[in-house]
């Protein structure tokens, strides 16, 4: 996923090795006041800035194909994009078995996301949340699942979190030449 254009993202120790929805995770984004890239801790599960009460359902994914049309995602897509660095992601195959997709060499990679700033009316505290953008699966992942996170090339990190309002051409299925899908994790059954 080569490239050396984003030193701050590549040199960080804050890479998601295991994350679950509602968990606070390290995310890179552009500071709206300074325009500079910053790292922060955001909660996985998007709460749109315009809602009055905490919704019961907080999406963890946003489809690239409809992100510019859906009210819940379009403002964040235009103004508040982020990158989640991870070493792999989990998908369930057709049999319900968990599969892990990672780089062959174990290197971290950046996934496109969007973030929001929401003020809780009960506590008056601000909460930053995010969702990961998904695209149709590439040919490596398609036998396991029909969707995958939008993996960014390192050279595109700055553009993704930059001020451009529609970098939609970056939301494509990653070719996957350097990705590997783990075999299904099975339970060992020992017979006497």
Model-derived regions, located:
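Short linear sequence motif anchored by a di-proline
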Residues: 1-192
């Amino acid at each position: 996923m080569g490239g050396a254009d984003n030193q701050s993202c590549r040199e960080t120790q804050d890479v998601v090795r295991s994350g679950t929805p509602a968990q606070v995770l390290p995310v890179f984004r552009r500071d709206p006041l300074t325009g500079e890239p910053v790292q922060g801790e955001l909660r996985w599960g998007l709460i749109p800035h315009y809602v009055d009460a905490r919704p019961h359902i907080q999406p963890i994914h946003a489809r690239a194909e409809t992100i510019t049309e859906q009210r819940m995602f379009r403002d964040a897509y235009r103004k508040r994009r982020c990158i989640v660095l991870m070493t792999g992601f989990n998908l369930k195959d057709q049999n319900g078995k968990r599969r892990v997709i990672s780089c062959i060499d174990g290197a971290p990679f950046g996934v496109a996301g969007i973030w929001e700033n929401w003020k809780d009316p009960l506590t008056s505290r601000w909460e930053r949340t995010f969702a990961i953008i998904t695209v149709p699966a590439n040919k490596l992942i398609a036998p396991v699942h029909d969707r995958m996170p939008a993996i960014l090339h390192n050279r595109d990190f700055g553009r993704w979190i930059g001020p451009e309002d529609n970098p939609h051409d970056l939301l494509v299925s990653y070719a996957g030449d350097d990705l590997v899908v783990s075999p299904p994790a099975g339970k060992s059954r020992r017979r006497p």
